[in-house]
């Protein structure tokens, strides 16, 4: 009896396995086999046939997955967009690294600009008042892009920090100016100028330095606005009590200037960050460069306009101004930490107290004091607090605040 031969079995095919976490299609046909071992784990796309749809790992959107088993990237759907996205990310990372280097070298750029302005004033005399407003406004816009509307609301809910900074602004600096002028026995015109600048509100440059020093930018903006609004009353009052001469201030002019260069750009930046985040992510790497360049140019311009007076004023007035701002930075931080304010906000208060609106002091001294040398301490102040602030920004930027242990 002949042996019965079993008919050849049909090629076995492994059925499709549906796993809740992973969809893989396997077959013994090597032409259609998917190879996954060499692909990135975080972004995986499996292409098993030219006629079958592209599958992806469950939970990972296919729009984010550009890796494939096919060795020819040009044949992978979406591969071109992936290369373009990678190129954009690469350039953005490069700009971020350059901006970080510029930010860490902030003191060097400011000091260099001041030295050049003192040596060759015409190099910085081209800066017009309108250019100053535009430069500061763009910088404030960049800082506003780091905020959200919720950040500004949170700052408004910080009465302790806001009140402490306001009180330190109008107590530490005026008293320091008065005591230093007495201690160094300054001439009357230098003493009046030193007291005048110590009674001025916080300067808009403090917001830039706070931004670079990783401080609380929203709190800085509110402190600058609050001290500026109060300057219409407190600056002439404190100056008249400590310097013996009344100084008139235009409150509406202060309000308009503050709104133009601080409040409006910051609010616009926060709105852009809230509703146009894609645009913000695109331009944000350029903002550190704009901030550093703006401060350096404005400081150089302040020195260039008063170079002859600064050179002829001697060491005494320079020393007095340096002591004034050093006391503001030091006591602003130490007293804030003493009363239990967090590190980031203490940095902000220190910068706000130590940095004054020196330009306002120059204008008031030139308009309301008979001796033009009264404006010299104010001009020196614009350089001194910028150098101090830039040094602190460089140090604090490399030391991110850690308030978790408080």
UniProtKB/Swiss-Prot annotation:
Superkingdom is Eukaryota
Q: Does the keyword Iron apply?
A: no
- Tell me which residues form the transit peptide: 1-64
One short Pfam name that applies is SBF
Mind telling me which GO cellular component terms the entry cites? chloroplast inner membrane
Which InterPro entries does this one have?
BilAc:Na_symport/Acr3, Bilac:Na_transpt, Na+/solute_symporter_sf
Q: Answer whether the UniProt record assigns the keyword ATP-binding to this protein.
A: no
Per the record, membrane topology reads: Multi-pass membrane protein
Entry's transmembrane regions = 98-118, 123-143, 152-172, 187-209, 217-237, 252-272, 278-298, 315-335, 376-396
What Gene Ontology terms for biological process does this UniProt record contain?
pantothenate import across plasma membrane
Q: Where in the cell is it found?
A: Membrane; Plastid, Chloroplast envelope
Q: Which UniProt keywords apply?
A: Chloroplast, Membrane, Plastid, Transit peptide, Transmembrane, Transmembrane helix, Transport
- What does this chain do? May function as sodium-coupled metabolite transporter across the chloroplast envelope.
Family assignment from sequence similarity: Belongs to the bile acid:sodium symporter (BASS) (TC 2.A.28) family.
Query: Protein name, please?
Result: Probable sodium/metabolite cotransporter BASS1, chloroplastic
